[in-house]
Structure formats: structure tokens, C-alpha cells
């Protein structure tokens, strides 16, 4: 891996070689909590699992505090389960592995993105790759909000085909997730797996760039359990901005949503809970929360938790996508 810098995004100067002691196939480069992070996969056979057993492809991060000095030590970022039998583990065994690590979009105190589920097979051209949704609270360790869920199947976004040749598609994530207006645009690779034995290439070996679009930040929704009429959820501790700010939500069915604030130990705050709970007047991608009691600006710089209560009715089906703190 090498760094590179540019004054204009067109002309680039490569940095020094030998930053790391291993081969890395990376999909993303981002900054989180002041650290520069490269997220990718490694195939190094010296990386062992439980009891010294072999491992398949898994995701790791490589970290720098200043972009110039990179830690020689890496950290596991996202890994899929290895087979129970250690003899069935390894790069060339037929089970799901992680390809290219994780490519996230950073939203301040959370990162949301995609990883590729590499459907490893003994015959290379039988391999395909689907996308899974992952998120992180520190930019290093990622997890699936719903374990085992395929966010985008390769067969639902296939690479341009070749007549009478049913090649598999491998979806490849990258630093191509952008918020543009009211959309989240996901640019990603579609790899036509036409690899031949012994690493030779055919004229069918090919890749292309694809685009999938979401309503902005609507990666998934939190809803009331189908068998219930109401439910609630707490946030992790959040330090509110020291300057003027506004809390907003990305939601539908907002007449069925109420917002409360507590201290870090879950004790609800007077003026921000109960009859003074916040509410939203309209559905939308960034709807302001209205507070009948105190304004959250009075809590500037303090650490709080956000509690959201959702209530379903015959006319309202609340769906929560995101909560924002917007500096004004």
C-alpha cells in the first residue's frame, strides 16, 4: 500500500513504499475520530484463527494518526463466521468470506456502508459476490444490523452478460457512496468473473461501474413489531454540539413518533420527556423536532441519550430511518 497526494485531484505524487508488511486489497479510505483509515481484505496465510487454524478472507483496517505514519499492526474490522471444523477453513475452502473489507459513508458518530459476501468455491469461476449492510460506532469494528441479510444480490445487479456464457457477478464496494440532494447514491463495481485456470485472462474478463440510489440515508428502517402497537429504542450516549444546533429525524408516519432525552444513565430529563416530549409535524428526510418544553440548546455540550417512542394506529405506520444533530 502507498499513499498519494494531489493539489488539484488530477496530478498525484506517490508516497513512500513499504508502509505495511503485508499485501492488502482495499476498498475504502476515510477519516474517523481524527484517524486515517484504510479498510480492506488480506490474504496472508500467516493470519491464523482460533487455535492457529487457517482463516478465509476477512476484513481489516490499517490506521494512521497523521497520514504519514502508519501503524504496522492492523485490527480486524469485519469477519464472517469460519466453519466449525478447522479442517474446512482457509482461503481456498468453499464457504462465505469477506472480499475487499468494508466501504462506509461516515456520518459523524456512525459509519454505514457495504461489504462483499464472497461466495468462495473450489472452481474460481463459480464464485460470486453479494453486498451486506454493515455499520460501526468507531470506524474500526463493523457489524451487520441483521446478521446474514443480503442487502443487494449479485443476480439483481448483474454485470453485462456474454451470450451463451453464464458468468457470475461479483459486486465490489468502494469509496463511491455519496449524498447528493435528496438521494444517497451508491457507485460500485460489477466484476464479470471470467477468470481462467492458472490466472490467465480471457477477452470476457471485464468490470463496470453501477449505480444504486436510495432516498437520502434510508438504508433501513426501524418499525414497531408486527404483533405490537408500540415500541421504543435508546441511542448510545451522544455529546451535543457546544454551538447552536437542532435535532431532526428522517422518518415517515411521524405523528406516531415521540422523542425524549435522558442523561447518560437513562434518567429522563424534565422538560424533554413525558408531556414535554419532542414531536415532528411532518414526514421527511430531515424533519425538525419541536419541543413544547425546553429547547435542547440548553443542553449544549452535555452528553445525553435519545429515546424514541413509536406508536402504530390504523392510520399511522411510523418508520424511523435516522436521527441528526444539525449545527445551525
Describe the predicted segments one by one:
Residues 1-328:
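Carbohydrate-active catalytic/glycan-binding domains of CAZyme proteins
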Amino acid at each position: 500500500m502507498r499513499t498519494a497526494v494531489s493539489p488539484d485531484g488530477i496530478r498525484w505524487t506517490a508516497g513512500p513504499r513499504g508502509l505495511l508488511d503485508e499485501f492488502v486489497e482495499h476498498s475504502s479510505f476515510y477519516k474517523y475520530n481524527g484517524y486515517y483509515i484504510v479498510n480492506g481484505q488480506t490474504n496472508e496465510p500467516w493470519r491464523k484463527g482460533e487455535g492457529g487454524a487457517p482463516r478465509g478472507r476477512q476484513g481489516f483496517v490499517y490506521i494512521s494518526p497523521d497520514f504519514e505514519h502508519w501503524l504496522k499492526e492492523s485490527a480486524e474490522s469485519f469477519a464472517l463466521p469460519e466453519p466449525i471444523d478447522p479442517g474446512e477453513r482457509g482461503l481456498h475452502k468453499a464457504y462465505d468470506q469477506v472480499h475487499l473489507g468494508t466501504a462506509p459513508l461516515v456520518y459523524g458518530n456512525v459509519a454505514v456502508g457495504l461489504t462483499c459476501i464472497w461466495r468462495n468455491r473450489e472452481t474460481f469461476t463459480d464464485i460470486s459476490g453479494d453486498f451486506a449492510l454493515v455499520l460501526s460506532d468507531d470506524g474500526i469494528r463493523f457489524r451487520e444490523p441483521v446478521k446474514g441479510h443480503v442487502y443487494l444480490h449479485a443476480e439483481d445487479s448483474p454485470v453485462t452478460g456474454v451470450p451463451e456464457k453464464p458468468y457470475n457477478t461479483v459486486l465490489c464496494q468502494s469509496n463511491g457512496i455519496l449524498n447528493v440532494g435528496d438521494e444517497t447514491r451508491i457507485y460500485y463495481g460489477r466484476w464479470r468473473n471470467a477468470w481462467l485456470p492458472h490466472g490467465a485472462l480471457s477477452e470476457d474478463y471485464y468490470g463496470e461501474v453501477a449505480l444504486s440510489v436510495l432516498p437520502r440515508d434510508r438504508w433501513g428502517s426501524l418499525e414497531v413489531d408486527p404483533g405490537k402497537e408500540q415500541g421504543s429504542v435508546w441511542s448510545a450516549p451522544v455529546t451535543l454540539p457546544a454551538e447552536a444546533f437542532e435535532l431532526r429525524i428522517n422518518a415517515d408516519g411521524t405523528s406516531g413518533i415521540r422523542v425524549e432525552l435522558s442523561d447518560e444513565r437513562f434518567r429522563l430529563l424534565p422538560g424533554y420527556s413525558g408531556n414535554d416530549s419532542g414531536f415532528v409535524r411532518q414526514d421527511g428526510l430531515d424533519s425538525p423536532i419541536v419541543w413544547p418544553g425546553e429547547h435542547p440548546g440548553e443542553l449544549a455540550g452535555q452528553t445525553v441519550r435519545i429515546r424514541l417512542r413509536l406508536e402504530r394506529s390504523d392510520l399511522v405506520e411510523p418508520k424511523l430511518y435516522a436521527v441528526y444533530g444539525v449545527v445551525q
